């Protein structure tokens, strides 16, 4: 997992509340167990007018030329609700998203995102609405997200602050998933095992 320090990127709006994981990555695309290749199916039922994915929906923001290459998604409350499938953050990351900004997230999705190097940022309703208005008003609008400073800078330069658990922040800054975090303590683990009394087996 790559460390996340800060990111400045093109922002795209998904102005919907309660975006569930079945909309993020529909169940028919969950047959793989590796993390790559899910981006093409991201928001499939909204991005395409047909089941095969041959007819893009021109009204969906991700299909509009002005949002091509977007890496920051701004959405509404309770993002990532529904089933606990880890494929949802996989699909978002594989598509190219680095940050998801919303007023609130489903708990399991929030944790899965952090474990996969995708930063979920919680801002107030008013701050999210301001970001959406600024992104909509200016083509090519970029947002800056600084995990070290815990700030979000809007396209106009407005500064918002966000909170994240210290442990999650540490893991993201250092590029540590669950396995990486365990390996970072390998010497301590080895020392503990070496000093276990023989009578304990």
Swiss-Prot record:
Its EC number is 4.2.1.33. It is an enzyme of class 4 (lyase). GO terms for cellular component: 3-isopropylmalate dehydratase complex. GO terms for molecular function: 3-isopropylmalate dehydratase activity. SUPFAM superfamilies: LeuD/IlvD-like. It catalyses: (2R,3S)-3-isopropylmalate = (2S)-2-isopropylmalate. Pathway: Amino-acid biosynthesis; L-leucine biosynthesis; L-leucine from 3-methyl-2-oxobutanoate: step 2/4. It holds the Pfam family Aconitase_C. Keywords: Amino-acid biosynthesis, Branched-chain amino acid biosynthesis, Leucine biosynthesis, Lyase. GO terms for biological process: L-leucine biosynthetic process. Coiled coil: none annotated. Heterodimer of LeuC and LeuD. Catalyzes the isomerization between 2-isopropylmalate and 3-isopropylmalate, via the formation of 2-isopropylmaleate. Belongs to the LeuD family. LeuD type 1 subfamily. HAMAP family: LeuD_type1. This is 3-isopropylmalate dehydratase small subunit. It comes from Shewanella halifaxensis (strain HAW-EB4). The gene is leuD.
């Amino acid at each position: 997992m790559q460390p996340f320090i800060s990111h400045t990127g093109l922002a795209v709006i998904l102005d919907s509340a309660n975006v569930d994981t079945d909309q993020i990555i529909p169940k028919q695309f969950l047959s793989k167990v590796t993390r790559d290749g899910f981006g093409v199916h991201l928001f499939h039922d909204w991005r395409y007018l047909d089941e095969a994915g041959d007819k893009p929906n021109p009204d969906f923001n991700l299909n509009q030329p002005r949002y091509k290459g977007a890496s920051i998604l701004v959405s509404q409350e309770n993002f990532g609700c529904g089933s606990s499938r880890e494929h949802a953050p996989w699909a978002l990351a594989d598509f190219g998203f680095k940050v998801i900004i919303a007023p609130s997230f489903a708990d399991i999705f929030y944790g899965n995102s952090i474990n996969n190097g995708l930063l979920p940022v919680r801002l107030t309703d008013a701050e999210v609405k301001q970001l959406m208005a600024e992104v909509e008003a200016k083509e090519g609008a970029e947002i800056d997200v600084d995990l070290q400073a815990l700030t979000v800078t809007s396209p106009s330069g407005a500064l918002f602050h966000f909170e994240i658990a210290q442990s999650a922040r540490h893991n993201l800054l250092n590029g540590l998933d669950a396995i990486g975090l365990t390996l970072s303590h390998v010497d301590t683990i080895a020392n503990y095992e070496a000093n276990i009394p023989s009578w304990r087996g």
